[in-house]
Amino acid sequence: MDQERLTHLKQLEAESIHIIREVAAEFDNPVMMYSIGKDSSVMLHLARKAFYPGKIPFPLLHVDTDWKFREMIEFRDRTAEKYGFDLLVHKNPEGIEMGCSPFVHGSSKHTDIMKTQGLKQALNKYGFDAAFGGARRDEEKSRAKERVYSFRDKNHTWDPKNQRPELWHTYNGQVNKGESIRVFPLSNWTELDIWQYIYLESIDIVPLYLSDKRPVVERDGMLIMVDDDRMELQEGEVIEEKSVRFRTLGCYPLTGAVESEANTLTGIIEEMLVATSSERQGRAIDHDQSGSMELKKRQGYF
């Protein structure tokens, strides 16, 4: 990797660490969202660097939908034990009681109940006034126009037409009681940046990002992995073993794999250098209606 590229990644690293430290100093009760994916892994690594050799001074929060890949949950618990950070796990109790499922209730309702409402419950329960997220501007058009410090009102809603100006590296974190800020330290990173940084820093990731033979079914133009016996097959669907990996991770019935032979980090980086589509194309929740992601973000989704 050439020196110019290394310098670019160091600049991104420095910017993100600056943002993380600013939030820790400025807010009374911040939290870092931990979705277990590649961006969360990078953000956690940056937080550890920001306060090394001390402990991360805020907890991590995982909003568990009960439908994540098994390997994600295993990785989450293993990582928490390895680094000893304070991990909070929240499941929407109403959603669990009603048996909320992407198969029964559909992607939109499942996401709203288990992710959006679950997140708002957790933020209210613990009284967090700032929440870090790993979203990047290159992922999706509604995220492209969101600020690094993204203001949320008392109902956790976002108004894209009423965002605060951000001049250079000056961020406005003033909030009234009950209001909060969503903070995105990786805003200026790209998917390629993330993978090159993971490679350079030897950051652990969920094995699902690497190609392997996995059982999948083709549904709505996506390859859905059969992760457990709750998978409901539709008429005519056949489970096949294919060499696939995931560019993005979420609830397994709503996350599409891509056919790939990239079973190493260098292989993934080589794929990223020629990729022409966003990783979010593999997320069913982004396509369940027009303007889907922006609508979800307005309602309180990350």
Swiss-Prot record:
SUPFAM superfamilies: Adenine nucleotide alpha hydrolases-like. Its EC number is 2.7.7.4. One of its GO terms (molecular function) is ATP binding. Pathway: Sulfur metabolism; hydrogen sulfide biosynthesis; sulfite from sulfate: step 1/3. The keyword ATP-binding applies. Pfam families: PAPS_reduct. It comes from the Bacteria. InterPro entries: PAPS_reduct_dom (IPR002500), Rossmann-like_a/b/a_fold (IPR014729), SO4_adenylTrfase_ssu (IPR011784), Sulfate_adenylyltrnsfr_sub2 (IPR050128). It is an enzyme of class 2 (transferase). It catalyses: sulfate + ATP + H(+) = adenosine 5'-phosphosulfate + diphosphate. The keyword Nucleotide-binding applies. Keywords: ATP-binding, Nucleotide-binding, Nucleotidyltransferase, Transferase. GO terms for biological process: hydrogen sulfide biosynthetic process; sulfate assimilation. Residues 280-302 are annotated as: Disordered. With CysN forms the ATP sulfurylase (ATPS) that catalyzes the adenylation of sulfate producing adenosine 5'-phosphosulfate (APS) and diphosphate, the first enzymatic step in sulfur assimilation pathway. APS synthesis involves the formation of a high-energy phosphoric-sulfuric acid anhydride bond driven by GTP hydrolysis by CysN coupled to ATP hydrolysis by CysD. Belongs to the PAPS reductase family. CysD subfamily. Heterodimer composed of CysD, the smaller subunit, and CysN. This is Sulfate adenylyltransferase subunit 2. The gene is cysD.
